[in-house]
Amino acid sequence: MAATVATVAYLGLEARSVEVQVQLTSGVPRFTIVGLPDKAVAESRERVRAALAAIGLALPPKVITVNLSPADLPKEGSHYDLPIALCLLAAIGATDAESLSHYVAVGELCLDGRITASPGVLLAALHASGSDKGLICPAAQGSEASWAGELDVIAAPDLLALLAHLKGTSLVSPPPPVEAEPPEGGPDLAQVKGQEVAKRALEIAAAGGHNLLMSGPPGAGKSLLAACLPGILPPLQPGEALEVSMVASVAGELGGGKIRRKRPFRSPHHSASMPALVGGGLRVRPGEISLAHLGVLFLDELPEFQRPVLDSLRQPLETGSVSVARANTHVTFPARVQLVAAMNPCRCGHLGDPALACSRAPRCAADYQARVSGPLLDRIDLHVEVPGVSAADLTLPPPAEGSAEVARRVAAARQVQADRYNGHGPRTNAEANGEMLDRFATPDEPGRKLLADAAAAMRLSARGFHRVLRVSRTIADLAGADRVGRIHVAEALSYRRQAPRN
């Protein structure tokens, strides 16, 4: 007796077809799984055996061979439990094999027969929809699967309910799509007193999707400013929301099947390892930079990160994706992020403060700032000093302009960019390539002369030159200008200041 059930294997954000095949033959009873299974898949034998026993079914005393085809594709994860169990049930005649042929199945089994959540259901649903099949998944993830469009989803809480549905004796209700609840409001720019230059840089960064580095003493408000950024960014468009939710799904972080509408804001600790930041691990998983896709990656205390970890961000910041290579697989995750970083000018943080003079200056500052490589700094569009706030500033009334007003200007600038690049590929000025910059961001004659003189005086690299053009284009968009002018270039150049080096 033989039976087959369709399921998937995850490679990055791609779900590949896998066929679970079960063969029952005579011989000394044993249960074998072949087809490059990992430890979690191999252990599914005991979970499946116990789950079937919990609903009153015992495995036949035969040689049970489970093959996961194609055999050369690595199989990882616990979501193979359910398709293996269904394949066994079809092989012993407990359910109709023909009805199962119209579905893709994913889900982890408990020992009592319950079907519990497993990562990647949204990807499996999209794959099933593209294959003109339905999806069998855990009840807790039915809403997540229903976002894949017109798709027959059977979201069953346990094996008994699933068998009853397949036999037609008791149907499982179709799950409705559930959109994410609006998140609780974060800090407002109205709470930040002073720091007008930093607020302006934050607005420019939000409007164009530019990378930002804030440098200043402890307690100046760098982290608070970064936390205000999500409040002025526009919400995700439907296609972007699906991209972000797919990354969250494969990482197992899409709670309650709720599609993300708010742009991600990830803030890993400075002790984070390279796999934690860019992805990897024994079972390849998206890192923080991919979980921040189309959102913000905030690195506080930037020089405290390990230098190899920081340098691993250089390629993703340029390409918008990160590739993780293993001996038997190669996985690519999206990583189009807006990098926001904060750092102190030196280890003690008080360089240049006459009241709290650094005892090791200037050597302390040079050593501390040298922890961040020049190529990484060159990829940051906006460098802004955030000075300490005086007691007089703290006693002032709150500023009249808060996040809502800034968000409106940012949204207007983003709409200008969306109209400009419609059909060309980029979504923001930060994503524009050289051809797009030549077409849309070439300054007028005074602006070109200023940029040429500054490029020579500041020794701008080709990358730095293009980043100044991108920031200039964003400043012009915020000002409602059709053409990039000298004033826009001048402001953009003022943000190219880098930390002093010996």
Regions found by a protein language model. Give the residues of each.
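Walker B catalytic acidic pair
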Residues: L294, D300-E301, S312
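Solvent-exposed alpha-helical segments within well-ordered globular domains of core cellular machineries
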Residues: A3, V18, A42-A54, I84-A90, ...
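Conserved catalytic network of the ASCE P-loop NTPase/AAA+ motor domain
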Residues: T25, G56-L59, D96-E98, A128-G130, ...
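P-loop NTPase nucleotide-binding/switch module
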Residues: K167-I204, G208, P238-I289
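Walker A/P-loop
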Residues: M214-L254
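Basic, amphipathic alpha-helical bundle interface domains used for macromolecular binding and assembly
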Residues: V34, A40-R45, P60, N67-G77, ...
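Peripheral, non-AAA+ core regions of ATP-driven protein-machinery
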Residues: M1-L213, P217-S223, A325, F465, ...
